Amino acid sequence: MCIKRKKTWIAFLAVVCSFCLTGCLKEGGDSNSEKFIVGTNATYPPFEFVDKRGEVVGFDIDLAREISNKLGKTLDVREFSFDALILNLKQHRIDAVITGMSITPSRLKEILMIPYYGEEIKHLVLVFKGENKHPLPLTQYRSVAVQTGTYQEAYLQSLSEVHIRSFDSTLEVLMEVMHGKSPVAVLEPSIAQVVLKDFPALSTATIDLPEDQWVLGYGIGVASDRPALALKIEAAVQEIRKEGVLAELEQKWGLNN
């Protein structure tokens, strides 16, 4: 395990232990349920999306299935808008959020997050049509397309004088640029790496993030008052990683580059 990933695991365990020590092991919800209920937002390929058969598939869904097997439960995937996921998690309507959710300081104040994919994200990807070796500052574009509820949307919202157009799915964001409605879009690097293969007319450039805006990869969200469940999921992820299954899933979904 690399040093950065180890630091992320240590940070997670420290947070969970702090909850345990303050008596938060008394968890709400039905811990004896035979189902592992996972909330997702199926608009973020290859992590989760709806295939041609109308089924929710992707890297996260396969991982959720592996975790449910480790927990001895049946997987139950439920779709929500991205903005509603954390609320439903806190209300124990779902056991976990697995939806390509970035680990950020603001989210760590609300929920527990178990790292499972990626390391520090130090830049975002600017997407535009045609060739442009010297992109303009974001404030110079008439609008910037981005997906609702994502870290990149939150980052853009923190910048003054950037006109943002937010959409529910990555596909809508890219079509906004393809049709010339917004001159540029901003994507997370691993998403851009996969989805842009189907959009050869689009080009990219990088947007460096200030150090205090770096993201610690992707995490599985668990309600902060359910640390025992978080530890079980964390142990399952560790086993899945050690067995090589996580690497196989990354390869299957084109996330191992």
Curated annotation (Swiss-Prot):
Its main location: secreted. PANTHER family: ARGININE-BINDING EXTRACELLULAR PROTEIN ARTP, MEMBRANE-BOUND LYTIC MUREIN TRANSGLYCOSYLASE F. Contains two domains, D1 and D2, which are both exposed on the surface and bind to epithelial cells. One of its GO terms (biological process) is amino acid transport. SUPFAM superfamilies: Periplasmic binding protein-like II. Probably part of an ABC transporter complex involved in arginine transport. Binds arginine. Interacts with host epithelial cells, suggesting a role in host-cell adhesion during infection. GO terms for molecular function: amino acid binding. Disulfide bonds: none annotated. GO terms for cellular component: cell surface; extracellular region; outer membrane-bounded periplasmic space. Belongs to the bacterial solute-binding protein 3 family. The keyword Secreted applies. Keywords: Amino-acid transport, Secreted, Signal, Transport. Pfam families: SBP_bac_3. The lineage of its organism: Bacteria, Pseudomonadati, Chlamydiota, Chlamydiia, Chlamydiales. This is Probable ABC transporter arginine-binding protein ArtJ. It is found in: Secreted; Cell surface. Residues 1-23 form the signal peptide.
